[in-house]
């Protein structure tokens, strides 16, 4: 199959990478796993055993008229322990390489079908100026866009840093969530070739 390149000849690409059937269940599983892996998982609360304080019975069992109590660290007391205290945990889910690559291919194929993948010969700017990048995107009629280049262009990265809904990544930095999140994905010809090699 071929991808149309803006202002240049069409680019021949692999059917298995850019013409794959849409697999919603696979993409959902991989996206959920990716989001789960991004969770910090460091929350920690103290149980009644871990709260600092005396273990002495606050008052005798009978005769005071007050409710019976055996421990100031009881969960029903103010500043007591938490009944089911949250502990640090690893939320990451295992995703096989084959599944991950399959999901990326499926997303790229769907982007092609929806005309959301824009292939350009090169995407460069002369200076790290946001104004220059805004004008370049306006010329291509692009707003909400992910720009993927073969290697990270510092000028491009710095210019896009302050723009809302514009992100710049190299091929190694792409992930299923960012590919889905943007309305358009701009890819250079060299990046397309690298993606094909990476997903082969």
From Swiss-Prot:
Belongs to the universal ribosomal protein uL4 family. GO terms for cellular component: ribonucleoprotein complex; ribosome. Gene3D superfamilies: 3.40.1370.10. Part of the 50S ribosomal subunit. It comes from Mannheimia succiniciproducens (strain KCTC 0769BP / MBEL55E). Pfam families: Ribosomal_L4. Keywords: Ribonucleoprotein, Ribosomal protein, RNA-binding, rRNA-binding. GO terms for biological process: translation. The keyword Transport does not apply. One of its GO terms (molecular function) is rRNA binding. One of the primary rRNA binding proteins, this protein initially binds near the 5'-end of the 23S rRNA. It is important during the early stages of 50S assembly. It makes multiple contacts with different domains of the 23S rRNA in the assembled 50S subunit and ribosome. The keyword rRNA-binding applies. It comes from the Bacteria. InterPro entries: Ribosomal_uL4, Ribosomal_uL4-like, Ribosomal_uL4_dom_sf. Residues 43-71 are annotated as: Disordered. This is Large ribosomal subunit protein uL4. SUPFAM superfamilies: Ribosomal protein L4 (SSF52166).
């Amino acid at each position: 199959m071929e991808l149309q390149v803006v202002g240049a000849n069409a680019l021949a690409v692999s059917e298995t990478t850019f013409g794959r059937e849409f697999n919603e269940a696979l993409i959902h599983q991989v996206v959920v796993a990716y989001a789960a892996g991004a969770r910090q998982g460091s929350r920690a609360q103290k149980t009644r055993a871990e709260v600092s304080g005396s273990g002495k019975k606050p008052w005798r069992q009978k005769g005071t008229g007050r409710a019976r109590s055996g421990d100031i660290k009881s969960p029903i007391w103010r500043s007591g322990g938490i009944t089911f205290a949250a502990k640090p945990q690893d939320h990451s889910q295992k995703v096989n390489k084959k599944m991950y690559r399959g999901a990326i291919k499926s997303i790229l194929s769907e982007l092609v079908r929806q005309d959301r993948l824009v292939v350009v010969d090169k995407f460069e700017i002369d200076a790290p100026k946001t104004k220059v990048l805004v004008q370049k995107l306006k010329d291509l009629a692009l707003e909400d866009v992910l720009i993927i280049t073969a290697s990270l262009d510092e000028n491009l990265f710095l210019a896009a840093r302050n723009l809302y809904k514009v992100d710049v990544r190299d091929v190694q930095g792409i992930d299923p969530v960012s590919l889905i999140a943007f309305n358009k994905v701009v890819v250079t010809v060299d990046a397309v070739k690298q993606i094909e090699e990476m997903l082969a």
